[in-house]
Amino acid sequence: QSIGHEDEPDPEPTEFKKISKEVIEKTVAKIDAKLSGNEKASSKAKAKLRYIKNNFVANLEKYEQQEAILGERNSYSKTDKEATFMRMKEDHMQNGQLKPAYNTQISTENQIIVHYTIHQNPTDTKTLKPHLEDFEQTFGKETLQELEEITADAGYGSEENYDYLEQKELTAYVKYNTFDKEQDKNYQKKHKPFSKENLYYNQDEDCYVCPMGQKMHKTHQSKRTTEAGYQQSLSHYQAKNCEGCPLRGQCFKAKGNRSIERNQNLERHKQRTRELLLSETGIQKRKQRTAD
């Protein structure tokens, strides 16, 4: 094994190709033929070839088995292969513990458990859709539609989840990640006065207005895929003449004119969610959720 580590670092590959058992065996056979017919071949080269023969195929099979167990996760426990390493809540010493675990999702109604699912993904955002799909499969489509409303905390407030709940015709009393901050009386003071959230957006003209009162027109659209594989549509806006602006140092420090992006669909969901959560029914549901 030491022979295999003595060589100089390999150069960066120009391209990455899938390696299979057959490819390794074919390559080894070619090298073996070259070395066998070469009297000047060094013993070191032959030792390396033996190392490849004895280890590469076996290691590849081991790695393929590990990848199959891993699936779409980034870790798994050797003692419980279905468990994923997750960051636990802080202990009494304020240390975050990384341990193999499962993410359990529980649906309740007036403190009565009506459904539960167990997930390998530590992120709550990615569990809402499969949890409700399992509920629908267990109890039927009509029962899911009878729910009419879903209440959840900010851990579930993603564009994908809002779209899914809208598709299922379920009213979403589901916080987005900045909802609680927006209710803080000092939120605007704490927030940077030149941040995107504090810029005025003109919906009729589809443009932003910068702190100097100049319009930031839309320049183009783009697509972005989230970690969960969900495709988002983004609108991009750009200011003009930032170089001579007296507020530039406070507003924008990078070179060129300031650019910002807006997710129209997500902003639509957030506006609707904000109205729901601040309504009398929404306030009551938020109180009930903490009790449940």
Predicted regions, residues:
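Anion-binding and metal-coordination hotspots
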Residues: Q1-D292
